[in-house]
């Protein structure tokens, strides 16, 4: 049952979805797992946000928690822009805003994968044409990645497996990474199918959605003809 309701949830559990989506819980998971994230903080008031920006330093990326499609996301480069954002922002204790260090001149990477709780299948590692900070829905990406070293691709695949198994994901999931110099950062994890899954299927021939659907009904990766 899920959240006290008489409903059976197939695939990734509600708790695992919350751990991937909740800022503080995921940061704790990342620390335990040895994953690097941009410096960040959460705020529910103007004072919270000003304190976070003072600690992190400009530029910062501010966005609401638990939203899709990049709604409300802004890159702020100075105090004037922060003041303007705070005038328009909706602030409430139950509607936190996330403040992150903005990684300038970083390459964004999208990964689509599937996990059955025992194994992880990395469907594709996609390189974005635009720098990190442009929402992935507005960005062009490539399969295969064009400018990423084999060593970095191996690190990305390894961290994808750590995340999929560590969060107990069952089915599809998507990870957004950023590469800045030789550093690899985890930007966010989406414990679900993403907008790029159809692109992965067309470009690679790998039916990731079908594979993930079979996982959710009890067919592990080892029993699928992949």
Per-region residue spans from a language model:
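Short acidic active-site motifs
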Residues: 48-49
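A short, GP-enriched loop/loop-strand-helix hinge that lies immediately N-terminal to
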Residues: 1-21, 36-42
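ATP-dependent carboxylate activation and anion-phosphoryl transfer catalytic cores
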Residues: 1, 7-11, 29, 33-34, ...
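Short acidic-hydrophobic, aromatic-tinged amphipathic segments that line or gate anion-handling sites
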Residues: 40-45, 75-78
């Amino acid at each position: 049952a899920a959240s006290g309701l008489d409903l059976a949830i197939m695939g990734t559990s509600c708790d695992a979805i919350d751990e991937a989506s909740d800022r503080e819980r995921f940061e704790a998971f990342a620390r335990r797992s040895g994953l690097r994230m941009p410096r960040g903080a959460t705020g529910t008031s103007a004072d919270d946000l000003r304190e976070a920006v003072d600690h992190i330093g400009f530029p910062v990326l501010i966005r609401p928690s638990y939203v899709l499609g990049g709604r409300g996301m802004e890159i702020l480069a100075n105090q004037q822009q922060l003041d303007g954002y705070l005038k328009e922002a909706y602030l409430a204790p139950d509607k936190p805003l996330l403040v992150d260090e903005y990684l300038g001149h970083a390459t964004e990477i999208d990964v689509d994968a599937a996990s059955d709780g025992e194994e992880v299948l990395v469907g594709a590692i996609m390189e974005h044409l635009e720098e990190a900070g442009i929402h992935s829905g507005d960005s062009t990406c490539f399969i295969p990645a064009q400018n990423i070293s084999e060593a970095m691709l191996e690190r990305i695949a390894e961290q994808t497996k750590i995340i999929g198994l560590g969060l107990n994901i069952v089915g599809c999931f998507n990870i957004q990474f950023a590469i800045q110099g030789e550093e690899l950062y985890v930007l966010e994890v989406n414990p679900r199918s993403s907008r790029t899954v159809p692109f992965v299927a067309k470009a690679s021939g790998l039916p990731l959605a079908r594979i993930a659907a079979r996982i959710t009904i009890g067919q592990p990766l080892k029993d699928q003809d992949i």
